[in-house]
Amino acid sequence: MRAYERLLKYAKVYTTSDPESGTHPSAAREFDLAHLLVEEMKSIGIEDAFVDEHCYVYGSIPATKGCEKKPALGLIAHMDTAPDAPGENVKPILHENYDGGDVTLPGTGTVMKTSTFPFLKELKGETLITTDGTTLLGADDKSGVAEILTAAETLIKKKLPHGKLCIAFTPDEEIGEGASLFDIPGFGADFAYTVDGGDVGGIEYENFNAASATVTIHGFSVHPGSAKDAMINASNVAMEFHMALPVMARPETTEGYQGFYHLCQMYGDVTEAKLGYILRDHDAGKLQFKKDNLLHIACYLNGKYGPGTVEVEIKDSYRNMLEKIKPHFHLVETARKAIEKAGLTPEEIPVRGGTDGAVLSWKGLPCPNLGTGGFNFHGVCECTTAERMDKATEILLNIIELYSK
């Protein structure tokens, strides 16, 4: 079975994670795919496959004769899809021998224009996989799941030499909790890769340092007819707070290594207002500056409107994995060789986000990220191609081969 055929099956299983539930997994529906995967893993020869009570799927393939002393390699992908777009009743569509032009998604009439998505022209002649426009596809990261299992099946069927291969599929990555209950000792790998990136050939070993901030503004309500010099409108103070942040440090104005402040939520009235931010930067020092800046703005506004008017609560989320990858840079070097062996040029770009691998790296399991061949994640224009998924699978097999020597 080719990887894309697995994706078509997995995409139809509803696994959107729920950021509000507070449970692990965040949604019981994630077990539906987990149980399907365990059954499939056992059917291809991964005899110890199981899913635990928190919806983490684990399994391993023992080393072949002569490779018992080779390092144990881990491959990890996540099963959940992002809550940013609908993930139920996904209807994948195959566009065979895609012509490289605009694509109309029939469920909504949404047009994927090459002027908006220039990469589409590079997919000409491939089998493009999209949705009907009513949902996301779930290539993030069911493509990674499919590619790992296709590589595992090939390994077993062809009896290729390899060290121990450890496989895991996680829940709740999209809400930042994919690695929270991951059993690293039980997983058994010396190091690993997440297969959760964008276009095939990508290697990611730098990610954002991340924090979140909740800004609460306490106002003072007075009848507007007699409010002069008395009312403090919390919503107005909230706008003043936000406008004190640099306009050129927002997601829509930054790229590459440039960090940002992202206003995710805002609501309020005269009496109280709240602002929810995420803060991101590859440089830990620059992230600290952003956190300090929020506190300085609050201090200024409290001086203007009175003590306690503005409160800021900041929480750290995850850290840049680079520091933990550097001592194990063979992971990057091996991935480069594997990608080149597949006839591609490695592309190494900083992740403008986070991965399970970033958290796992800081927990002691070095874990860079590899491309899956997908594009436009978290939206109805999400897509991939059968050929790029084949190539991603080939790269995984090349990595396994290189670590068996």
Where are these regions (language model features)?
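Active-site metal-coordination/substrate-binding segment of hydrolases
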Residues: 67-161, 169, 189
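Phosphate-handling active-site elements
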Residues: 153-166, 247-254, 405
